[in-house]
Amino acid sequence: MRFHRQGISAIIGVLLIVLLGFCWKLSGSYGIVSTALPHNQSAIKSTDLPSIRWDNYHEFVRDIDFDNSTAIFNSIRAALRQSPSDIHPVGVSYFPAVIPKGTLMYHAGSKVPTTFEWLAMDHEFSYSFGLRSPSYGRKSLERRHGRFGNGTNGDHPKGPPPPPPPPDEKGRGSQKMLTYRAARDLNKFLYLDGASAAKTDSGEMDTQLMLSNVIKEKLNLTDDGENERMAERLYAARICKWGKPFGLDGIIRVEVGFEVVLCDFSADNVELVSMLEMVQPNQYLGLPAPTVISKEEGWPLDENGSLVEDQLTDDQKAILEREDGWEKAFSNFNAVKSFNQLRAGAAHDNGEHRIHIDYRYLVSGINRTYIAPDPNNRRLLDEGMTWEKQLDMVDDLEKALEVGFDATQSMDWQLAFDELVLKFAPLLKSVSNILNSDGDINESIAINATALTLNFCLPICEPIPGLKNGCRLFDLVICCQRCRRNC
């Protein structure tokens, strides 16, 4: 007896529908609010939370478009994970997050912050950003010319190169590594999914941009330095100002590792437990400060500030040879420093377990507007995200913040989804291999596919009246369809 590939594929399709339908049913049961309610209706009530049960969840859910049938699944699985966040870089959701009491966080800078500022969850992250070694030889000219830029969009400033730094700044000896400890459960953070710290214009920062735009209008912020400040600092300032009445602790973003924008260092939410002077490698190794290469010091430079090599004196050539050698050695140090940060970030591929998520108050753009299935091309702020929808999302965030978050009261959906993947991914992969094997579809292939799928369906199926001689292959499709109705 021969079987058609279409028939076997139907079995797999039904199995997937059963599995995803079961997951979607569970998500409704536990109130993931981002996709749960009809337009213009909030799921969050600060004083009267809805009771969502297996027998009434239909009142709180709506169909999700097929193209994004796995979007919420992938968003939850990628949350607080380094590589999955990079694979799905354009985030569209706000995850309520809690940083438990006693958690250590780090900041490298020249002074103790008093307002909003960045903290890193790993000291390698802060160390890499805070310790910028002075450059030697020809490399020092590149840095002074602003090759890497300091403008809002990364463009280097126009005009002549800046003067060399004053002597007391050459070693940057005032840089400090600060270690903070959470003095209480910081239970009002918003974690922005995707590669939300990426300074791009391709959507990674849409969740911050949307909040910033709505906040500007709601708070009537007409003169807050919008054109002079770096975009991410402007967003952070607005978000913290908006969130202050609600007790917002800050936002959490994904960089190489996870970073926290803490809204207020002066409150009783964190305590400074360590402050160490950061020592520059050249100071530690006893090397002199870099030679100042400028026209004032007698160096041949053209109108662009570049060295005129054929006009160098023998002494200048010797200085450059020596310092270029030091710079080459320091480049190895900087490479290892960057590698340490990458390794610290990669350690969280399986999750940043020092941060906990309360999935009950998840707010997402999924099913509010069209979200492209391609994780690299989707945008939260597309044509379908009307101003009214943006206001609705911010309204849901405000109501969630009024409640406060408690991850211990939330279903751990990431754990549940991980179990589904671990259990069923091998099954689906094996069935796919069987169906896509070379040669004609014959009884042996059909039997092998049935052997893998039969035991998945039967435990959740009722006997089918009138079915004789057991379940044949195509009878299994009917069996699974019945299971789907029962589920």
From Swiss-Prot:
Classification of source organism: Eukaryota, Fungi, Dikarya, Ascomycota, Saccharomycotina
Leader sequence segment: 1-31
Record InterPro entries: YOR389W-like
Taxonomic superkingdom: Eukaryota
Organism: Saccharomyces cerevisiae (strain ATCC 204508 / S288c)
Presence of the UniProt keyword Glycoprotein in the record: yes
Residues listed as glycosylation sites in the UniProt record: 40, 68, 150, 220, 304, 367, 442, 448
Chain residue ranges for the region called Disordered: 141-176
Post-translational modification: N-glycosylated.
Gene Ontology annotations for the cellular component aspect, listed alphabetically: membrane
Name of the protein: Uncharacterized protein YPL277C
Keywords: Glycoprotein, Signal
